[in-house]
Amino acid sequence: MKELYIGGAVIGGTSAGAAVMSEVMITGDEKKKPKSGDEWQTIEADNVVTVRGFGFLTKAIVDQHFATRRRHNRLISLVLERPGLVGFGIDESTAAVVTGGTPIEVVGEKDIVVYEATIAKVARHGASMNGP
């Protein structure tokens, strides 16, 4: 499949099929609150369970059903842990068209949210943003 992709074939997926496009794939499980459901209540380090995806997108993490299932905190948590990766939150009936060397095109009925954290700062409760 990867050879076809490199050769210019169109690869697509919905739901988990979209998530598996990235090298780092979100499984949907939480380490700290395994029974919390689809809505991620907090931004927490080392909480999101990931596995290796197909790797068509090597510098991105894809999350699906994004706004509908309120998965902002899940994707923010991962992007903060892996600032070299860009997080793409994709809604239902929406697609990201990725072609070599060009901007991503958003098509469909809803939106794609992009999180990029290379200059992000994280402050724990009670800490200052200017220092420890």
Where are these regions (language model features)?
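C-terminal and late-domain segments of enzyme folds
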Residues: 25-27, 31-132
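Active-site or ligand-binding cleft "flap/edge" segments
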Residues: 1
